[in-house]
């Protein structure tokens, strides 16, 4: 029908101009900023080259900021009031309600005393019991980045490894197009998935009953599908021989996508949540427990559920007013540093980069464009950071190298280079070009002005840097590369990348 209703090409010329302007601007920033920083750093004795980019540099800086926060984190002790509660039918634990943290033990003891209670054993009573039936829907279908994040979490595969495995499954006509940014499908996809439910269940080796037979907005929403729908299995299910030809990661990814798709048709996970409030003098303790009532879709993820098991206790049967023996305790704990990025959590951070900026307009634009990078490019950006030796992976955690740290310190004062805000500012105006409300020439002129600003500011920024950590690291690397002494001149013989 599209070919029967062809539109004049000039109707879409502004979109071409928008994309062309973005490409020119990226090129201008990269071709000027990269040699500018490289040459200025080389003048200070730093070897190697440094490349910068609108997406690459803010991504590196995200990891750098997180690493700095971890390295500079100072643990602080705090105290909380907890309770071990014993009733006729069993025992359970409770936490102070509302939760409070105390900086010192003395502060906690004074608080407990002010509530006519004490640390240690004393009598209490069950003040309230509430039980509600709750449900949990099956997980959303996968976009590329959500699948990459999940596979990294479960199997420690890198984003690029997942994309490569996905590409193979797509070319084998087993999974849909991988480079998609939406977790939704249309009613057409829902219909064929429903028709092939039996084949997918058979592949999983389970006799499953389809319960959710009507499309639900959580998964099926044509208005949220543009070029490509969520990642789902095709009508073709692999044979035993086809499965045997797949590598291990491909088998795991295919099974994960099939399970997530099949789960959409299974019953919800149902459970009872019970909240017990226990009163000791004027102290109130809350205890929460969950009792599964219907396993539903979780039957597909039993192993995964075991690994991700919530720390939720099973509560005994109690009645309001029941007597309880309560052991009130002072629990000493420590504040915890932020967690280092993995490739999976970094992908999520790139997609939700709006959370790292303060400007409301920038936040709005970043939400619209879904952060920095695209579904198709984020994996290659992370891979590029590794290849350029800005970051390395240690036990699945992303760590910034001394070279990466030096670059981040060098660009630190140039907010537009380190923040996702540049993407927001660009996209705001680029969208205007696409709507014929903006001018390509004006935009490129502003980019050139920014480059002139960099030419003036960067040499001063480099002058202020402390190179001691970088030089120390380089000296250690140089020592490791020494393989012996030259018998003729007595100088060190060193291993280099090439001869």
Task: State where each predicted segment sits.
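Phosphate-backbone binding and catalysis cores of DNA-processing enzymes
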Residues: 1-123, 127-133, 230-291
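Conserved short loop/turn motifs at secondary-structure junctions
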Residues: 46-49, 131-140, 149-155, 178-187, ...
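Short, highly charged
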Residues: 52, 109-113, 119-129, 140, ...
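Basic, low-complexity terminal or inter-domain segments flanking catalytic cores
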Residues: 70-72, 159-160, 164, 181-499
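C-terminal accessory/connector segments of nucleic-acid motor ATPases
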Residues: 73-94, 122-165, 173-174, 342, ...
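Short glycine-/polar-rich loops that comprise or flank the Walker A/P-loop
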Residues: 172-173, 388
């Amino acid at each position: 029908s599209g070919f029967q209703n062809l539109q004049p090409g000039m109707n879409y010329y502004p979109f071409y101009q928008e994309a062309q302007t973005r490409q020119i601007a990226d090129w201008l920033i990269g071709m000027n900023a990269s040699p500018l920083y490289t040459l200025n750093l080389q003048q200070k004795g730093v070897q190697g080259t440094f490349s910068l980019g609108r997406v690459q540099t803010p991504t590196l800086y995200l990891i750098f900021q997180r690493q700095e926060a971890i390295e500079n984190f100072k643990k602080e002790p705090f105290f909380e009031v907890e309770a071990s509660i014993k009733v006729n039918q069993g025992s359970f634990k409770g936490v102070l309600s509302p939760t409070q943290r105390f900086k010192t033990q003395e502060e906690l003891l004074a608080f407990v005393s002010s509530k006519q209670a004490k640390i240690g054993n004393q009598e209490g009573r069950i003040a309230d019991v509430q039980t509600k039936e709750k449900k949990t829907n099956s997980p959303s279908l996968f976009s590329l980045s959500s699948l990459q994040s999940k596979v990294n979490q479960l199997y420690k595969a890198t984003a690029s490894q997942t994309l490569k495995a996905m590409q193979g499954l797509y070319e084998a006509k087993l999974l849909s197009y991988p480079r998609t940014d939406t977790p939704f499908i249309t009613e057409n996809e829902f219909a064929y998935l429903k028709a092939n439910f039996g084949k997918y269940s058979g592949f999983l080796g389970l006799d499953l009953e389809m319960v959710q037979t009507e499309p639900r907005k959580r998964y099926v929403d044509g208005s949220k599908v543009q070029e490509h729908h969520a990642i789902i299995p095709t009508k073709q299910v692999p044979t035993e021989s086809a499965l045997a030809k797949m590598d291990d990661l491909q088998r795991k990814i295919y099974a994960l996508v099939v399970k997530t798709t099949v789960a959409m048709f299974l019953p919800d996970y149902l459970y009872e949540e019970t909240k017990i409030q226990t009163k000791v003098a004027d102290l109130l303790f809350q205890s929460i427990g969950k009792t599964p009532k219907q396993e539903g879709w979780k039957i597909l993820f039993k192993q995964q559920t075991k690994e991700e098991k919530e720390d939720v206790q099973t509560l005994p049967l109690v009645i309001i007013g029941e007597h309880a023996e309560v052991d009130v305790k002072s629990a000493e704990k420590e504040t915890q540093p932020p967690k280092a990025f993995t490739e999976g959590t970094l992908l999520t951070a790139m997609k939700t980069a709006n959370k790292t900026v303060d400007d409301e307009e920038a936040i709005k634009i970043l939400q619209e464009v879904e952060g920095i990078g695209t579904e198709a490019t984020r994996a290659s950006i992370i891979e590029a950071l590794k290849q350029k030796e800005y970051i390395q992976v240690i036990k699945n955690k992303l760590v910034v190298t001394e070279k990466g740290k030096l670059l981040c310190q060098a660009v630190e004062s140039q907010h537009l280079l380190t923040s996702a805000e540049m993407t927001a500012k660009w996209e705001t105006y680029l969208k205007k070009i696409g709507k014929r409300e903006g001018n390509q020439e004006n935009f490129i002129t502003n980019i050139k002005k920014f480059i002139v600003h960099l030419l003036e500011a960067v040499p001063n920024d480099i002058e202020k840097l402390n190179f001691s950590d970088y030089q120390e690291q380089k000296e250690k690397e140089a020592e490791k590369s020494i393989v012996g002494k030259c018998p003729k001149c007595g100088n060190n013989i060193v291993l280099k990348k090439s001869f």
